Structure formats: structure tokens, C-alpha cells
Amino acid sequence: MQLVFASNNKNKILEIQSMLPESIKILSLSDIGCHEDIPETANTIEGNAILKANYVTQKYGYDCFADDTGLEVEVLNGQPGVFSARYAGEQRNDNDNMDKLLTELDDKTNRNAQFKTVICLNINNKQHLFTGIAKGNIVKNKIGNQGFGYDPIFQPEGYQYTFAQISLEEKANISHRGKATRALIDFFKN
């Protein structure tokens, strides 16, 4: 089965493809000729996932799934949240985003945070949502060089290392995206 993943983010595509059964082949947006930016104008993570999946299904006619992920920091009332990718500006620079967040948390003792991923699957004219959450905290300095996004500053609950210090396989077992993707996989098994 071929399924479009409404993304051109190579890191996300690799992470999700590594978790799916071999019988499901992921096509990226560029694989189907979609080169435009898909609007992410919703004010929730769920809303952005739905917008992206609906865009591909309606404009290109493919069954597809889309995800949106946000880092929600407790003391910042859930920010950066839906703005996580462009927290420090529209250029979407991971280091700038982390630096801005670390500066905002510099004098804070409460560094509790969670990553939230929502996957919206449009298949056979039906829509399904799958959510994954990874609780943890924001460390004071960037640690590790694996992963992407906020991985170097997010320490999952119960662990002594950041997401950027572990392998893709280990991260998939405990991450927000891993949990949401396993829910998606379970859907296909049933």
C-alpha cells in the first residue's frame, strides 16, 4: 500500500517510515508533485494536521496522513505549541528556536514540558486522528546531536538524557511521534 505523508521533512519521513510495516510505502509531497507550502493556519496542533491532510486529499486526490507537532511548556502556558517550528521567526531555524526558548526559561525553576503529535489520516473518505504525548522537561543547555527540532533540550520523563542523545529506534519507542505512529499502525492492523 502506498500512502502520502503530507511532509517534505526528510527527518520526519525517515522516522515514521522506520516504524511502519514494510507493506506501507510512504510517498512524500514532492513524490506526488506537491511543491507548494501547505497552509498551517489553525490555532491548534490538531487543526494543522487536519488542514494538511485535507489539502492533499482534496487537491491531489490521495489517501494520506499528515502530522503536526508542538512543544508545550507549562510555565509558558503551552507555548511555543502550534508555533514550535517558527517560534523564533518564519525562517524555521532549530537553533534559533531553542535559543529563544532557553532564554525565556533562564530564570524559571518549572521546566516541565510535553511534546504533542497529532496524526490525521484521510483514507477511504474517512478521517481518523491519532495523538501521542511525551512528557518531560527542558534542560538548561543543548545536549546531543541526534534528531532534530527541540530534541537537544528535551529530556523525557524518567530518563537522564535528551532525545538528541539516543538512537532513532530508541526515540521511536518513547517519543510523542512514536506513540501517535503506533496508534496509526494499530489502526491498519485492525
UniProtKB/Swiss-Prot annotation:
<feature type="active site" description="Proton acceptor">
    <location>
        <position position="68"/>
    </location>
</feature>
<keyword id="KW-0547">Nucleotide-binding</keyword>
<feature type="binding site">
    <location>
        <position position="171"/>
    </location>
    <ligand>
        <name>substrate</name>
    </ligand>
</feature>
<dbReference type="GO" id="GO:0036220">
    <property type="term" value="F:ITP diphosphatase activity"/>
</dbReference>
<dbReference type="Pfam" id="PF01725">
    <property type="entry name" value="Ham1p_like"/>
</dbReference>
<protein>
    <recommendedName>
        <fullName>dITP/XTP pyrophosphatase</fullName>
        <ecNumber>3.6.1.66</ecNumber>
    </recommendedName>
</protein>
<feature type="binding site">
    <location>
        <begin position="176"/>
        <end position="177"/>
    </location>
    <ligand>
        <name>substrate</name>
    </ligand>
</feature>
<dbReference type="GO" id="GO:0035870">
    <property type="term" value="F:dITP diphosphatase activity"/>
</dbReference>
<feature type="binding site">
    <location>
        <position position="68"/>
    </location>
    <ligand>
        <name>Mg(2+)</name>
    </ligand>
</feature>
<dbReference type="GO" id="GO:0009146">
    <property type="term" value="P:purine nucleoside triphosphate catabolic process"/>
</dbReference>
<keyword id="KW-0479">Metal-binding</keyword>
<dbReference type="GO" id="GO:0046872">
    <property type="term" value="F:metal ion binding"/>
</dbReference>
<dbReference type="InterPro" id="IPR020922">
    <property type="entry name" value="dITP/XTP_pyrophosphatase"/>
</dbReference>
<comment type="similarity">
    <text>Belongs to the HAM1 NTPase family.</text>
</comment>
<dbReference type="GO" id="GO:0036222">
    <property type="term" value="F:XTP diphosphatase activity"/>
</dbReference>
<feature type="binding site">
    <location>
        <begin position="148"/>
        <end position="151"/>
    </location>
    <ligand>
        <name>substrate</name>
    </ligand>
</feature>
<keyword id="KW-0378">Hydrolase</keyword>
<dbReference type="GO" id="GO:0009117">
    <property type="term" value="P:nucleotide metabolic process"/>
</dbReference>
<feature type="binding site">
    <location>
        <begin position="7"/>
        <end position="12"/>
    </location>
    <ligand>
        <name>substrate</name>
    </ligand>
</feature>
<feature type="binding site">
    <location>
        <position position="69"/>
    </location>
    <ligand>
        <name>substrate</name>
    </ligand>
</feature>
<dbReference type="InterPro" id="IPR002637">
    <property type="entry name" value="RdgB/HAM1"/>
</dbReference>
<comment type="function">
    <text>Pyrophosphatase that catalyzes the hydrolysis of nucleoside triphosphates to their monophosphate derivatives, with a high preference for the non-canonical purine nucleotides XTP (xanthosine triphosphate), dITP (deoxyinosine triphosphate) and ITP. Seems to function as a house-cleaning enzyme that removes non-canonical purine nucleotides from the nucleotide pool, thus preventing their incorporation into DNA/RNA and avoiding chromosomal lesions.</text>
</comment>
<keyword id="KW-0460">Magnesium</keyword>
<keyword id="KW-0546">Nucleotide metabolism</keyword>
<dbReference type="GO" id="GO:0005829">
    <property type="term" value="C:cytosol"/>
</dbReference>
<dbReference type="GO" id="GO:0017111">
    <property type="term" value="F:ribonucleoside triphosphate phosphatase activity"/>
</dbReference>
<comment type="subunit">
    <text>Homodimer.</text>
</comment>
<dbReference type="InterPro" id="IPR029001">
    <property type="entry name" value="ITPase-like_fam"/>
</dbReference>
<dbReference type="GO" id="GO:0000166">
    <property type="term" value="F:nucleotide binding"/>
</dbReference>
